[in-house]
């Protein structure tokens, strides 16, 4: 049958898909001069940040103690340019006025944020070093820090989270969420950039972990695979829609351990030095030092 016989079907589909009511809420109107967030550019940003934080493990593998300053300098310059463009894309994308081009003020703001982010890279390296140390110390199968940095999906997910969290704190819209969802796709770990997580954090056998937007996690906390730190319920507004931004996820204090497939829901507190066993649901506060495990089935 000739393709021409299908022309009316294709035309009808185009007409229906072009009706404004059909794409209401699904359409982003592009304006000339407004950059859009780029998945490729954001991947490059993450790889550059990794190459700066973990020199020699990512990026140029020929870096040594004599050339490290040069390589970091080159990567920082590239990172600044790429990050400025993507931050600008986020600022323009998140603007309430979709019909106006990005302003010079927004361009200056994007460059300022990129510079401040880069100024925080030494602190990001310091805290990620504690995460690597926690993973190494907590896993007898790990033979070196290099193995942890190169191989462990948890370190990849935590690195993305810490980069994204810093950008979120600096006021960047959209981009932080894309960065953590990239790690979600790669590793199966869903860490919202809004969560606050202390140092020496590790996820053993890192996959399937969910950490919600308003979670607060102290220092030296260890999660195992499949742990969910989620919301128990969503308060609704007068229109029946979830109220955004309210605290609704758990607080884990220092030195907490949560074993595999445990589910902890709601704005509850797991006290310092507590242990939560695997495959259980927790919806109430857990005292400091407590040990919560499954109860034995009654005969």
Give the location of each predicted region:
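Structural signal for interior beta-strand "rungs" in well-ordered beta-sheet cores
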Residues: 183-299
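Terminal amphipathic alpha-helical/low-complexity segments used for targeting or macromolecular assembly
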Residues: 1-178
């Amino acid at each position: 049958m000739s393709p021409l016989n299908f022309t009316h079907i294709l035309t009808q589909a185009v007409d229906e898909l072009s009706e404004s009511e059909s794409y209401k809420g699904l359409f982003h109107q592009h304006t000339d001069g407004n950059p859009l967030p780029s998945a490729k550019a954001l991947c490059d940003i993450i790889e550059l940040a990794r190459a700066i934080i973990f020199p020699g493990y990512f990026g140029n593998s020929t870096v040594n103690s004599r050339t490290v300053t040069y390589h970091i300098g080159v990567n920082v310059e590239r990172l600044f340019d790429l990050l400025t463009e993507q931050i600008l894309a986020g600022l323009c994308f998140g603007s309430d006025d979709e019909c106006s081009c990005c302003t010079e003020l927004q361009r200056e703001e994007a460059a300022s944020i990129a510079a401040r982010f880069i100024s925080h890279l030494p602190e990001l390296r310091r805290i990620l070093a504690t995460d690597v140390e926690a993973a190494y110390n907590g896993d007898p199968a790990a033979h070196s820090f290099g193995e942890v940095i190169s191989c462990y999906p948890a370190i990849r997910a935590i690195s993305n989270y810490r980069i994204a969290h810093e950008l979120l704190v600096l006021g960047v819209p959209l981009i932080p969420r894309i960065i953590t969802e990239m790690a979600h796709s790669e590793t199966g770990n869903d860490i919202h950039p809004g969560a606050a997580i202390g140092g020496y954090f590790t996820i053993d056998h890192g996959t399937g972990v969910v950490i919600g937007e308003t979670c607060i996690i102290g220092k030296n906390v260890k999660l195992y695979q499949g742990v969910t730190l989620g919301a128990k319920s969503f308060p609704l507004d007068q229109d029946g829609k979830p109220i955004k931004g309210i605290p609704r996820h758990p607080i884990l204090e220092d030195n907490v351990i949560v074993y595999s497939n445990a589910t902890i829901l709601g704005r509850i507190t797991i006290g310092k030095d507590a242990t939560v066993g695997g495959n259980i649901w927790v919806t109430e506060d857990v005292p400091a030092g407590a040990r919560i495990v499954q109860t034995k089935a009654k005969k």
